[in-house]
Amino acid sequence: MIEATIEGVLPRAMYRVRSSEGRLMRVGVDAASSGIIVKLIVGDRVVVRIAARDPGRGQIVRKL
């Protein structure tokens, strides 16, 4: 899991984030966290779990 900053809001509850390492990724909200995380906007810091098969995708685990 890595820390990232939201850079853009995409359709279908997806977000474009930039990791602390500088990598740009497309992520969605984890199903378990969807009820906890109410709203995410550009500039919010989040913790992202990277997908095993595609390092350019992941899921938001929690908001910092």
Q: Where do the language-model regions lie?
A:
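A short macromolecule-binding patch
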Residues: 23-31
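Short aromatic-glycine-enriched beta-strand elements
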Residues: 11-17
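Short nucleic-acid-contacting surface segments enriched for D/E, G, S/T with interspersed K/R
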Residues: 33-47
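Short, mixed charged/polar active-site loops
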Residues: 1, 24, 35, 55
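Structural detector for short beta-strands of small beta-barrel domains
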Residues: 1-11
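OB-fold/S1-family single-stranded nucleic acid-binding modules
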Residues: 52-64
